[in-house]
Amino acid sequence: MVIASIDMKDGHVVQLKNGKDLVLQRDDADALINEFNMYGEVAVIDLDAAMRNTDEKGNTPNTKLLKSLLHKGNVRVGGGIRDVKKARELISLGAEKVIIGSAAWNSERTSDSDPILNTQFLEELCSAIGKQRVIISVDAINGKIAVKGWKETVNISLIEGAKEAQKYASELLFTCVEKEGCMQGTDMEQVKALREAVSCRVVAAGGVNSLEQISALEKMGCDVQLGMALYTGAVSLKDAFISCLDFEKTNGMIPVIAQDERSSQVMMMGYANKEAFEKTFATKKLTFFSRTRNCLWTKGETSGHFLEVVKLRADCDRDTVLATVRPIGGACHTGSWTCFGSDPDERSTLERLYGTIAERFANPKPGSYTATLNDKRVREKVMEEAEELTDDAETKEDIIWEAADLLYFVSVLMYKEGVNWQDVYNELDKRHKEK
């Protein structure tokens, strides 16, 4: 599939030619990641960190912006990650994977008998965050591994380096540096040789400039990281996503599973052809192809129960798609919330409770208790309910009742302070990753 890249330099989103010459610059990173994440993973790269343009604390003009993006999508982050502490911090802040460049290699290698990798660092890194979270860059110039912001090469060939690097990574990112930003196509022969040499996931970058090349790389078994072609409009993520799907295997129809973003509950399953995907991306509402009516249909166009699309992800075989959605009403024609059960209502979740609280404050209804809660009163109720839960609840039923009361008042307090449950989940996830 396709991974969109957000490269940052001097606090701006940029695209460089050959890693040196500025071609374009923009300042809409938030809008970009919100758009890019609909189609797949997003690579966020700190070019200043890669080039060691840092202050005494190791920060760059991009640090604040980069950290703010990590929880806004399925993000892999790279650029200047040279120690385990930095990698752990980025993972704890929300990055799903880290991209290791120069630090992975033995840059002092002069003979074939010298080690290829910085094995001590890589072993410590895998122990700290897990091999599955590590990507190693096998960027190359004229077939030699490039380091230090692509300013130098080391005495390591692409293929021998890749064979060793896969021992410490879940995937390899290959950038053909001499093709980077040139919009002339990548080096397909080098990519093919790399793909045949290793067993892990391979992502190709540098020069990819057409849907035809993306499709060819997909058939080769490689994912593609897009930069210049995306920003200049030569390739759209919509077309790239669709071009990677295997319609031949499924007679032109791809099964699409709709999953509630908030509860992770499966809502429904339908089939989509290319035109249905195009309409889904255009409207941001999940659209299928009706095999009985032989036409496109957007879920909700009759009932008003639309499925607003957050993101789409293809499976490993590219013949099934998972759509993460925000449902507006139930999905099933029977009136049930989901097509996979008899429950007629949306499952109660903390997010749903929070949404109801927000609605009560925004549009108070006569007799609404929630709307009467001022800051002082809600804090008193949190303390009161916590005491009842810990001191008065004796039976299982008592604990359930008091815990529900406490969560309600905690949710009200959070709303008033501008904190939502996703913020809390992120903090819990951060603590888990730090262990």
Predicted regions mapped to residue ranges:
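C-terminal helical cap(s) of enzyme catalytic domains, especially alpha/beta-barrels
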Residues: 108-128, 214-243
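Hydrophobic faces of well-ordered beta-strands that scaffold small-molecule active sites
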Residues: 2-8, 42-44, 75-79, 98-100, ...
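Flexible "arm" and connector segments at domain edges
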Residues: 159, 219, 225, 229-403, ...
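Catalytic cores of alpha/beta
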Residues: 65-98, 189-224
